[in-house]
Amino acid sequence: MSRVKKLLVAVCVAFLLTGCATPSLYLDRDLAARGIAGKNGFTKNLIRGHDFVLLSYVRIGETGKPLVIYIEGDGLAWESRSRVSSDPTPADPLVMRLAALDPSPNVAYLARPGQYTSMGASPCDAKYWTSKRFAPEVIGDIDSAVSRLRDMAGAPSVSLVGYSGGGAVAALLAARRGDVTGLRTVAGNLDHEAVSKWNNVSPLKGSLNPIDIADKLKGLPQRHFIASGDKVVPSYVAESFVEKVGDEKHESITIVRGVTHYSGWQDKWRDLLDIPLY
């Protein structure tokens, strides 16, 4: 084997061992999200933080108006219960579709670490889409990205929408920021310890937990959507969370019939957006 071939083999093995995604693994998923964004007036931006490069899509209709930011879920973090995915880019761009349906003048979509980014663009350590998906350094860079998006829109405030694990991120951000005027979660993982126990999977060691800061969200207008057919995040997770916020009667919770954790949200989203925050 020539020296060049040996070098190429070594490089390929290194990529496999570090868990980085090759272009062929994420290209189709990237094109799907990009297509939705392009058809609905969104432009692509890469936001470089201290530790991560985060992808965003932004649609600015009226500079100076509030900005609604949709935060992606955990994506394809695991290929099976025992095998970590080499690319956490979502297999289904559900959150991008929800963002595209939002009639607000200024809307942004924000991906999580490792999603929609090629090799070398962002850290390749799979712990940031598994056990440390809500680590302080992750939340810190997403927080900075939210500020960048807000400034891009010239927005006086932001409203956060988070799906699944993105709901956890949105809640954690809302607790640390002073410019958040509303919080919506969709099948949100608002207590990852409880969700891990429910699914009989390993706990997320090194991750911040939204339930621990729920009391800091008292007084913030919010709405938590629970899927009636959710087998991933049980309803008691949101119920326990809002009780800690101070909503003993669960008035900030809406149970959505005919949807599951993964499907059905798109068809109902416009109507769900009309439900006022509590």
PLM region spans:
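Short, surface-exposed "cap/lid" segments of acyl-processing enzymes
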Residues: 53, 59-111, 116-118
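Alpha/beta-hydrolase active-site loop
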Residues: 123-152
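Catalytic histidine-centered segment of alpha/beta-hydrolase-like enzymes
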Residues: 259-268
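Gly/Ala-rich beta-loop-alpha elbow adjacent to hydrolase catalytic centers
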Residues: 161-166, 170
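C-terminal motif of bacterial Sec signal peptides marking the signal peptidase cleavage site
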Residues: 18-19
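The feature captures the conserved acid-bearing segment of alpha/beta-hydrolase catalytic domains
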Residues: 188-189, 193-250, 254-257
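N-terminal cap/lid segment of alpha/beta-hydrolase-fold proteins
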Residues: 31-61
